[in-house]
Design a protein with these regions (language model features):
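N-terminal-proximal low-complexity accessory segments that begin disordered
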Residues: 1-70, 74, 78-87, 94
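Catalytic alpha/beta active-site cores
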Residues: 2, 77-78, 82-399, 406-413, ...
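Hydrophobic alpha-helical scaffolding
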Residues: 3, 7, 22, 26, ...
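Catalytic or ion-translocation cores adjacent to nucleophile or general acid/base/metal-coordination motifs
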Residues: 4, 13, 354-355, 378, ...
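Generic recognition of stable, solvent-exposed alpha-helical segments in well-folded globular domains
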Residues: 8, 12, 16, 27, ...
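Generic, well-ordered alpha-helical scaffold segments in large soluble proteins
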Residues: 12, 16, 20, 35, ...
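Intrinsically disordered or highly flexible coil/loop and linker segments, enriched in small
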Residues: 22-27, 42-49, 63-70, 85-89, ...
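Acidic, glycine-enriched catalytic cores built around paired aspartates
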Residues: 77-81, 85-138, 142-149, 153, ...
Length: 716
């Protein structure tokens, strides 16, 4: 640890900051560390006060529920109002400038990617455009009849071509006939011309859908660009490819504008427990903004180097030059107020507030983009987009706004350059969402919902009221539907339409694309102009929903409806333990134990913060700390209320450890648990998450995970 400006700084982090982060900006190392020291001195006590207020509120709520159980909504509302938890509604109107169209105007999928895996981050950044042919060919989006042939399977290819033709007929219909009849696509002064054997030549039913083209070269390669609902679709023409040869109009691919925005995550999807980990995470964010991030990997026996894609060049319909971004617009998610990091310590040995460090590093990295120091531009509007999670109520949002203002002042940035995305994932924020938005009215560019974290906080808030519903039953509760509807209602009432994102949560089954196509269209239909997906392929398939649904039109309709009743958020999701059969209890305990262990063993034992973890039935689910929080809180709640006992929990976890080990058999570096449960850091961490769940502030998992991961790293 190096002593810098009165701070003890981990050598990995110091080397990154001084050798990379500050390499081409007008900020010295002394100034950076002095700024961090001032921010820590100013905000750490305020953050500590906010966390103490959380604990005070929770203690009072616990006491009330012990006396009243779930109580009535009327009694609960009065109590929470008297407590200062439930605040008067506000009627804010946001006034935010310098917002990129990807956030303000273009509805579309949003990726969330761990910052600790540069290859994944590059994949996400480049997922602005995705191959529909690949997405259809390689997933269950199209039913598959038998095994695919090695190499290119022409039967499957024909199936993909037919599906693409049908999609084009639906979304970009011709004035007459079908895209299946096309023999050639070309541009003319009158727009798109499609040659067909049956009808001669024909144009689009709506000529305004033609956006541009790339001229056909000597080998017959070119492209046609179409647009619908703000998104673009490219018909790629290349008769020299295997697919183009098979296609009836020499089409090699249909490429969709897909992941319009991407959140580069420093929080729930990463395992960053020291300065080395933090430097890795920050390096990814910096490299994306500078445009020099690369990742090498082996593919087909060769070393492949991946880097960010360039912009895409076309000739517009009017003959002018047209440049479209080749990369997703990137936001960065910082840590919440409750987290600290040992990467930097104060003179008395205290860890600094991780969110303060994140904000400063995120903004300094943003200077490279704001000052045009890289080959590409992220924010053409001149903003840095920071998503702030785990905030409890408007006072904490106001604290973040003040922090961002202090960072701007220190770096000489215009006021409100640092925009804020508000994660609506804690109950005190949900019930006071209008007041939260009011505190950030000049910065807010995003609110979203997330079932898992929000349910985790719901469980912890009502922990002493009684045994909570099973995890699956939570999805049909009144409070959850109200939460999803009200988030949209409040945001639109505050003027988010055509200015900011209203987001919905993650599709958690990366392999279940047919199911996603069927179900996730509900998000744009609910008024969300962005929703989370687990992969670039999922982004391409989810983009179909935004091509089908006019989200701006949906938002206009929703804006005229009555705002969902806030009182319905106060219905406490508890049940009578006697209504749960022994089989129900066993299945729920086994399911959650397996989920907890499957995630924790990767986090603690392997340093993986987000991955596809098979559930008890073997279905791969995208897991991060949010999924862990709800599972650990549910089991802890049932333990407290006697639905299960400690011995049963321990026995179940021991059995499930063997199941998880078997599911991961053969994976390089996997630290098996069942052979020695007592010495397994991962197994002991999983048990601690349950047995300390009642006492852990807000039911968060980070402190337990971090401590056990640090032990595992030290022992490695």
């Amino acid at each position: 640890m190096a002593d810098t400006a009165g701070l003890q700084v981990d050598e990995h982090l110091r080397s990154f900051v001084e050798g990379e982060l500050l390499s081409d900006v007008d900020l010295t190392a002394d100034d950076f560390w002095a700024t961090l020291a001032r921010l820590q001195e100013r905000f750490a006590p305020r953050i500590a006060d906010a966390l103490a207020r959380r604990d005070e509120i929770q203690a009072r709520i616990d006491e009330w529920h012990r006396e009243h159980g779930a109580g009535s909504v009327e009694e609960y509302e009065k109590f929470l109002t008297d407590l200062g938890y439930l605040l008067p509604e506000k009627s804010p109107t946001i006034d935010v400038d310098r917002v990129d169209p990807e956030i303000a105007e273009v509805p579309g999928p949003q990726l969330v990617v761990p910052s600790t895996v540069p290859r994944y981050a590059l994949n996400a950044a480049n997922a602005r455009w995705g191959s529909l042919f690949d997405a259809f060919y390689g997933t269950d989006a199209l039913p598959q009849d038998g095994e695919l042939a090695k190499g290119y399977d022409e039967r499957r290819g024909a199936q993909v071509i037919t599906a693409a033709d049908e999609l084009l007929d639906e979304l970009f219909p011709l004035a007459k006939g079908s895209h299946a009849d096309a023999t050639a696509y070309r541009a003319s002064a009158d727009g798109l011309v499609v040659d067909t054997g049956a009808t001669g030549t024909v144009g689009l039913a709506d000529p305004a859908q033609f956006a541009g083209f790339r001229p056909v070269d000597g080998d017959g390669r070119g492209a046609v660009l179409l647009t619908r609902n703000g998104l673009h679709l490219e018909i790629t023409i290349d008769p020299t490819t295997q697919v183009g040869t098979q296609h009836h109009a020499d089409v090699a691919d249909v490429v969709l504008e897909s992941a319009v925005t991407t959140i580069v995550d420093l929080e729930d999807s990463v395992a960053t427990v020291d300065g080395e980990d933090k430097a890795l995470a920050y390096r990814t964010w910096l490299g994306l903004l500078r445009g020099d991030l690369t990742a090498e990997f082996r593919k087909g026996g060769k070393t492949v180097t991946r880097r960010v894609n360039p912009d895409r060049e076309y000739t517009a319909a009017d003959g002018s030059d047209l440049t479209l971004p080749g990369r997703s617009l990137m936001l960065v998610r910082n840590c919440g107020h409750h987290m600290t990091t040992n990467a930097v310590r104060t003179t008395d040995g205290a860890e600094v507030a991780e969110g303060v460090l994140d904000a400063l590093v995120s903004a300094v990295a943003g200077l490279y983009d704001l000052q045009g120091k890289g080959p590409h531009t992220n924010s053409r509007a001149g903003s840095v987009y920071i998503v702030k999670p785990k905030q409890h109520g408007p006072e904490e949002v106001a604290l973040t706004v003040e922090l961002f203002g202090a960072v701007e002042e220190a770096l000489g940035l215009r006021a409100n350059t640092l925009k804020i995305g508000i994660m609506d994932e804690e109950k005190r924020t949900t019930v006071n969402l209008s007041a939260c938005i009011a505190e950030a009215a000049n910065r807010v560019i995003f609110v979203n919902t997330g079932f898992l974290d929000r349910t985790g906080d719901e469980i912890h808030t009502c922990f002493t009221a009684g045994p909570v519903l099973r995890k699956g039953d939570m999805k049909s509760t009144t409070w959850l539907k109200t939460y999803e509807d009200r988030n949209v209602d409040v945001a639109l009432a505050a003027g988010f339409a055509h200015t900011a994102q209203v987001g919905k949560g993650m599709w958690a089954k990366p392999a279940a694309m047919a199911e996603m196509i069927e179900q996730k269209i509900g998000h744009p239909k609910a008024g969300a102009n962005c929703a989370w997906v687990p992969s670039p392929t999922a982004a391409t398939l989810h983009a179909l929903h935004y091509l089908r649904v006019d989200v701006h039109g949906v938002q206009d309709e929703i804006a005229s409806r009555a705002t969902a009743d806030r009182r319905k958020l106060l219905e406490v999701p508890v049940t009578d333990a006697s209504s749960l059969s022994a089989q129900d209890v066993t299945h729920e305990l086994e399911t959650n134990a397996q989920s907890i262990l499957g995630y924790v063993v990767r986090w603690v034992g392997m340093g993986i913060g987000c991955s596809t973890v098979p559930d008890l039935e073997g279905v791969g689910l995208m897991e991060d700390r949010a999924t862990l929080r709800i599972s650990a809180q549910l089991v802890a709640n049932w333990l407290q209320h006697g639905v299960v006992d400690e011995g049963t929990v321990r026995d179940t976890f021991a059995r499930m450890a063997a199941v998880v080990d078997e599911q991961n058999a053969g994976e390089d570096g996997y630290p098996a648990m069942a052979k020695d449960l007592e010495s397994s850091e991962s197994f002991q961490a999983a048990l601690e998450l349950v047995f300390s769940g009642a006492a852990e502030p807000n039911g968060y998992t980070e402190r337990t995970l971090t401590r056990w991961r640090q032990r595992a790293k030290a022992a490695a």
